[in-house]
Regions:
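Terminal low-complexity/charged segments
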Residues: 1-163
């Protein structure tokens, strides 16, 4: 599958941002968050991208935003496409993004992880408020760039002899 051709087909339907071709079988497209769900459904239902490989986040603290990347795979055509959306990163409280667990049920697991590690809420996603990895965590989410790992470690753990 030619990913530039796919991009042009999608651009005729949705207001897409730039296309970044990382290699012949992997490209990334930026798009407004409000067009993520219809674009995901189109890719799944009409273009053969039936596997959600991962959902991840990047904390762009300087810009006050998070970048969410939804990586999809078309196993028949042996290619992958990543959809990137930017959402606001509030100084306190949770960022918010629409859940896609009804499009890909496996997304619920990724969304739980992102809520716990980055503080991104996905309203309506199942089991979102249950501890996922960090049982009893009471600090800011540890993958946010303003989390001070050294300060946390010094306050939480004893020094080991010989270190």
């Amino acid at each position: 599958m030619n990913l530039s051709d796919l991009y042009n087909r999608l651009k005729a339907l949705f207001p897409l941002g730039e296309l970044t071709e990382q290699r012949p079988a992997l490209a990334f497209i930026t798009l407004p968050a409000e067009f993520l769900r219809p674009t995901l459904r189109h890719l799944r239902d009409r273009e053969g991208f039936t596997h959600l490989v991962l959902l991840t986040a990047v904390d762009w603290i300087e810009e006050g935003r998070f970048q969410l990347t939804y990586l999809l795979s078309n196993r028949t055509q042996a290619c992958d496409i990543g959809l990137r959306v930017m959402i606001d990163r509030p100084a306190s409280g949770l960022a918010t993004m629409d859940s896609i667990h009804d499009v890909w049920p496996t997304a619920a697991t990724y969304q739980r992880e992102l809520r716990e590690m980055f503080g991104i809420d996905f309203p309506g996603s199942p089991r979102l408020h249950e501890d996922f990895i960090l049982e009893g965590w009471n600090d800011i989410p540890p993958y946010r760039r303003d989390f001070d790992t050294l300060k946390y470690a010094e306050a939480s753990f004893n020094q080991r002899p010989g270190r």
